[in-house]
Each structure stands twice: as C-alpha cells, then as structure tokens.
C-alpha cells in the first residue's frame, strides 16, 4: 500500500467545505484541511500494516489451554460513511505445539485491522483468520462489540445501540462448551 496523500486529502476537504456552503478560508476552518489530512494519516495507518506480522513473535511454551485478552479498546472508520465506530475486541485462542504469542501482539493486531476504512464483520474475521494462518492454534474465537456513529448521528439515530460480531475457528467452531467458557469470561468483570 502506498503512503497517504495528505495534499490530495487537504484539497478534497476544502472542496467538501465549499460544497456544504462553508468558507474554508475563515479563521476556524483555515487549518481544518491540514488537521483532517493528519488525522486520516493516523486513523488509516493500518492500511500499511499486515496484522499477521504481529503474530510472528512466538514463545515456546507448553500451554494448550485458553488464552483470552478481553476489552481491547479500538476505534475504526465505517467504510460506508467515513464516520467512526468504536468498541472492544475480545481475542481468545488455544495454542498448539508450543506456539504462544505475546499478549500485546493480540492488541496490536486488533489495531492494525481497525485502523483502515472498515466493516466490523471484516475486523472480526480478519483477526481470526490471521491468527489461524500464523499460529495454527487449536481454536480462535473473536468477539467484537461496537457502537457505530453512522447509526447514532444519522439515519436511524439510535445512540447506545451496540453491534456484536463473532468469528469462531477450530475447536470453538465445533465445541459449544468451549464457546460458552469464553463468553462467560467476557461477561465477568
């Protein structure tokens, strides 16, 4: 993926401001195109990042039981409206063959996938599939819950409504008790 073209974004933001009847040269908006371009560089930084790279750090550990990192806060941008959605990701896996990854790597992978124009469903499945491809665990279960500003600010206007998605692979796809265990841990604070 190429670098974000901030100059092109600045011109586009100026055009949008003009199109909605604003004066992009007035004091409050004068630097807005630059600020938006800088923000887009940050919030879309995942476009240049492969989440699988985070799972290349492996620790040889004889552990083949559940590992769960829950409540990983994230934010992303809805690809349909380019407005934010944000929430928490819960990442669970059962390692296989001594392949345990660092806990921070799970959070970094969530960030890499979220920081791009995105759909919640794709975030969920991309994290799961990246883990399966690189770690070959017995099972992976990802649960993502998020509030979408496209449902809060426009259209149906339902603030507080949360969308929950899940992706289950391996053991979790076939074992209801294993899925229930993860869900019980997620619910407990």
UniProtKB/Swiss-Prot annotation:
Q: What is its EC number?
A: 3.5.4.16
Catalytic activity, reaction form: GTP + H2O = 7,8-dihydroneopterin 3'-triphosphate + formate + H(+)
Q: Pathway membership of this protein?
A: Cofactor biosynthesis; 7,8-dihydroneopterin triphosphate biosynthesis; 7,8-dihydroneopterin triphosphate from GTP: step 1/1
Sorted alphabetically, which InterPro entries does this protein's record hold?
GTP-CH-I_C/QueF, GTP-CH-I_N, GTP_CycHdrlase_I, GTP_CycHdrlase_I_CS, GTP_CycHdrlase_I_dom
- A Pfam match is GTP_cyclohydroI
A single BP term in Gene Ontology: tetrahydrofolate biosynthetic process
One example of the protein's molecular function in GO is: zinc ion binding
One Gene Ontology cellular component annotation?
A: cytoplasm
Residues annotated to bind Zn(2+): 78, 81, 150
Q: Tell me the keywords, alphabetical order.
A: GTP-binding, Hydrolase, Metal-binding, Nucleotide-binding, One-carbon metabolism, Zinc
Q: Does the keyword Hydrolase apply?
A: yes
> Which PROSITE patterns does the record match to this protein?
GTP_CYCLOHYDROL_1_1, GTP_CYCLOHYDROL_1_2
> Subunit structure, briefly?
Toroid-shaped homodecamer, composed of two pentamers of five dimers.
**NCBIfam families the record matches:** folE (TIGR00063), PRK09347.1-2 (NF006825), PRK09347.1-3 (NF006826)
What the record says about family reads: Belongs to the GTP cyclohydrolase I family.
- Its name, as the record gives it, is GTP cyclohydrolase 1
* Encoding gene per record: folE
